[in-house]
């Protein structure tokens, strides 16, 4: 009888010990599915637009096309052999008469206008992430392991904000007789001399010329759009600290890989300050494989033995994707992306 009692006690003790060990031994695998929201992803369009003849050119009273953005100078009926002409015109005497140098100033934008549109933000898009975590070793409150994830996010960035275009502007100075005053002119009511005249005379060739690079030449209006899908994976070591009975803090970092698929389009019109419009439209598609790194922190709430709520934030650097499509260069900045995640996990 005594032997039976001792055997029963030993078996009971072993069962309790085994049960306690199983309870203390956490589940080593966890899979989770989370919503993943990106922040701090930006895109920008840049490029150039050729400044040629306006689609609807301005003309003189005699039908000649303006040879400056803000006026014209041509030889008059006499042939201007004396170096003077009354066949000229301008838009604004307040800004185009240089009284100190007895000159009429006429200007034109030449070459290409450089375009740099405002940044577009990709905040608030919705994606997902499927993650697998494996504990490898550790103590009762701290565990070390690794994670592998698959994630996706779709981005749609667009803008119709206007901006200034810069280019090369040439300003030519035409002399008039000292002591005389050119006819008045104002925007919308410019002065226009005729081929046959008579009228106020100025020199038919400039006595000086100034070229300025990178000066604002007009305003760009229209729209720009970039649709991008980003498939990715993260692989790296993990650290988990069980700081409370049902809660733990996780830290991780490592390799990030992304496959980005881009569709870009634009429809823009450049309106020169001195008149004339130029329109440019286009589109393009491309994809690229990006390599980078990430760092992440999260919190796990184990509301049952196997089920948990997982949430956190991730910093990811996949560099800057850049591609030219015709007259535009598109840049998608993935170098400082922030992702916020929230989902549910299952341990086994």
Placement of each model-derived feature along the sequence:
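Short loop/turn motifs that connect adjacent beta-strands in outer-membrane beta-barrel proteins
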Residues: 22-29, 122, 133-146, 157-159, ...
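Transmembrane beta-strands of outer-membrane beta-barrel pores
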Residues: 35-41, 150-156, 255-263, 315-319, ...
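Residues on the lipid-exposed face of transmembrane beta-strands in outer-membrane beta-barrel proteins
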Residues: 128-134, 148-150, 233-241, 253-257, ...
